[in-house]
Swiss-Prot record:
<feature type="topological domain" description="Vesicular">
    <location>
        <begin position="173"/>
        <end position="214"/>
    </location>
</feature>
<feature type="topological domain" description="Cytoplasmic">
    <location>
        <begin position="139"/>
        <end position="151"/>
    </location>
</feature>
<feature type="glycosylation site" description="N-linked (GlcNAc...) asparagine">
    <location>
        <position position="72"/>
    </location>
</feature>
<feature type="compositionally biased region" description="Gly residues">
    <location>
        <begin position="252"/>
        <end position="261"/>
    </location>
</feature>
<feature type="topological domain" description="Cytoplasmic">
    <location>
        <begin position="236"/>
        <end position="261"/>
    </location>
</feature>
<keyword id="KW-0812">Transmembrane</keyword>
<feature type="domain" description="MARVEL">
    <location>
        <begin position="28"/>
        <end position="239"/>
    </location>
</feature>
<feature type="topological domain" description="Cytoplasmic">
    <location>
        <begin position="1"/>
        <end position="33"/>
    </location>
</feature>
<dbReference type="Pfam" id="PF01284">
    <property type="entry name" value="MARVEL"/>
</dbReference>
<dbReference type="InterPro" id="IPR008253">
    <property type="entry name" value="Marvel"/>
</dbReference>
<keyword id="KW-0968">Cytoplasmic vesicle</keyword>
<feature type="transmembrane region" description="Helical">
    <location>
        <begin position="152"/>
        <end position="172"/>
    </location>
</feature>
<feature type="transmembrane region" description="Helical">
    <location>
        <begin position="215"/>
        <end position="235"/>
    </location>
</feature>
<keyword id="KW-0472">Membrane</keyword>
<feature type="transmembrane region" description="Helical">
    <location>
        <begin position="34"/>
        <end position="54"/>
    </location>
</feature>
<dbReference type="GO" id="GO:0016020">
    <property type="term" value="C:membrane"/>
</dbReference>
<feature type="region of interest" description="Disordered">
    <location>
        <begin position="241"/>
        <end position="261"/>
    </location>
</feature>
Length: 261
């Protein structure tokens, strides 16, 4: 037991010595391993910023001749991240009653928060992981390349991140398609108040451009490509691709010395 405890202490002491030896080495950034990690870092920022920062609105015009109003009046519903459309109610201009209807009781249809939040949350985690990985590449280059576990952990995380980028981007792309439908021309069909029997005629006017959301989907799949491509370069750092330095040194010095002639 004492020998095992001493071995553990020695390992921790060696690890602490390596961690304390922080030296900035920018050479890994010139290699694909570090350079692609920088691209992944930037791409993750664009992914969660373009999605999480979106705010928009959709407008319809209302005409109700049965109550003596023959002019079109505008009713607006605002929405944004995390896209709980079923909580986005319609609003009229201040101190204006449109067709004697309480429009705040009428909301958009659909809840797409699960796909949007999963996408943004994962992108933020990727952003933080890229910072930690770059710090390890640049500040602890020797520790990373002399270790067997760190490159393997990095490789596993890279594979998992590639898969999750595919899943989250696909789910978010599908949700975005549904959001466009739910905030577009179909509003008039879905609103119960907009029917001839109620005497209220509704006409779709406009909806905020969702170009930034389209960009977020593009960056999602771009991230998937970057992480998938970087998996090869991370794999090359693992013991699966090349033997460790320890094994190499044993193989070189393990044979019996040759006798001179």
């Amino acid at each position: 037991m004492a020998s095992k405890a001493n071995m553990v202490r020695q390992r921790f002491s060696r690890l602490s010595q390596r961690m304390s030896a922080f030296q900035i080495n920018l050479n890994p950034l010139k290699e694909p391993l570090g350079f692609i990690k920088i691209l992944e870092w930037f791409a993750s920022i664009f992914a969660f910023a373009t999605c999480g920062g979106f705010k928009g609105k959709t407008e319809i015009q209302v005409n109700c001749p049965k109550v003596g109003v023959n002019k079109n009046q505008t009713v607006t519903a605002t929405f944004g991240y995390p896209f709980r459309l079923n909580q986005a109610s319609f609003h009229t201009p201040p101190n204006v009653s449109v067709c004697d209807v309480n429009w705040e009781k009428h909301v958009l249809i659909g809840d797409y928060s699960s796909s949007a939040q999963f996408y943004v949350t994962f992108a933020v985690f990727v952003f933080l992981y890229c910072i930690a990985a770059l710090l390890l590449y640049v500040g602890y280059t020797n520790l990373y390349r002399d270790s067997r576990k760190l490159p393997m952990i990095d490789f596993i995380v890279t594979l998992v991140a590639t898969f999750l980028w595919l899943v989250s981007s696909s789910a978010w792309a599908k949700a975005l398609t549904d959001i466009k439908v739910a905030t577009g021309h179909r509003i008039v069909e879905e609103l119960e108040i907009c029917n001839p029997e109620s005497g209220v005629s509704c006409y779709f006017v406009s909806v905020t451009s969702m170009g930034s959301l389209n960009v977020s989907v593009i960056f999602g799949f771009l991230n998937m490509i970057l992480w998938g491509g970087n998996a090869w370069f991370v794999y090359k750092e693992t013991s699966l691709h090349s033997p460790s330095n320890t094994s190499a040194s044993h193989s070189q010095g393990g044979g019996p010395p040759t006798s001179g002639m």
